[in-house]
Amino acid sequence: MFYNVVKEYPDIIVDYSVSRFEKFGSAVTLVAQIEFTDHSVRYIKDYLFVDGTRKYSYHWQDAYGQLRARWDNSPHHKHIVTFPHHKHESGKTSPSHERNLRDILEVIRQSL
């Protein structure tokens, strides 16, 4: 799935790599990196567990290593209406409906 989605965005993606992919039954681990046309980078950690639960972090930083945005579902920020899903941006945490690679690539496409 990762490769199929990445191929849909040749206008914004210049390079990508998968540093870890493991599948054990229905459990999946994906650790990857995507470089964009402005040299910003997105670091991906996505874990699907056997019980169907998922843990993810999509960290996007500029070419100088400064955070542009991070989407994750770490179970803190209980006050956010989309808890546990949220977005870190400009020093603030906000609700997030983007929860997968394609949704977040669309946000990045609009920003580039």
Where are these regions (language model features)?
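Generic secondary-structure transition motif, activating predominantly at the C-termini of alpha-helices
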Residues: 10, 75, 109-112
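Short helix/strand-capping connector loops at secondary-structure junctions
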Residues: 78-92
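Short amphipathic beta-strand/extended segments with alternating polar/hydrophobic composition
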Residues: 43-47, 68-74, 97
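Mid-chain, well-packed structural core segment of small domains
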Residues: 54-80
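Well-ordered alpha/beta subsegment
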Residues: 90-112
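Negatively charged, low-complexity tracts enriched in Asp/Glu with abundant Ser/Thr
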Residues: 1-46, 50
